Amino acid sequence: MSRRNAAVKRPILPDPQFNSRLATMMVARLMQHGKKSTAQRILSDAFGLINERTGGDPLELFETAVKNATPLVEVRARRVGGATYQVPMEVRQERGTAMALRWLVSFSRARNGRSMSQKLAGELMDAANEAGSAVRKREETHKMAEANKAFAHYRY
């Protein structure tokens, strides 16, 4: 690890189409092999489908979905005297959002058939309604942290 100053975090610029930082982060997670325009098209198509099906603002639904999938606590492995403990720790807001977006994208990809924009739209609508795989993953993460509460004093 470098002994110099901490790396400066680059500011995330809002997406030109939706004027949202969260949309920019989602495009980055959707992108494969540097194909940003394809990722942007997938997101805008998904938002179009959401608008068709719900009639509401897709950006609002997207923000709700991310909020519902964001974990508050997680477990991290900590080695103490030859034993490895799963230590529950709070998740910083930035990391929680990144985890939620990663889960939403990976579970969208895992859905059956259809185009990626349809799968993403379905996962986002499910997450906004407190359902779906990403929300279930968050609940599992919280349960793991609750089960390992006894090791909370090993926090670092």
From Swiss-Prot:
It comes from the Bacteria. GO terms for molecular function: rRNA binding; structural constituent of ribosome; tRNA binding. The gene is rpsG. GO terms for cellular component: small ribosomal subunit. Belongs to the universal ribosomal protein uS7 family. InterPro entries: Ribosomal_uS7, Ribosomal_uS7_bac/org-type, Ribosomal_uS7_CS, Ribosomal_uS7_dom, Ribosomal_uS7_dom_sf. GO terms for biological process: translation. Keywords: Ribonucleoprotein, Ribosomal protein, RNA-binding, rRNA-binding, tRNA-binding. Part of the 30S ribosomal subunit. Contacts proteins S9 and S11. It holds the Pfam family Ribosomal_S7. One of the primary rRNA binding proteins, it binds directly to 16S rRNA where it nucleates assembly of the head domain of the 30S subunit. Is located at the subunit interface close to the decoding center, probably blocks exit of the E-site tRNA. This is Small ribosomal subunit protein uS7. SUPFAM superfamilies: Ribosomal protein S7.
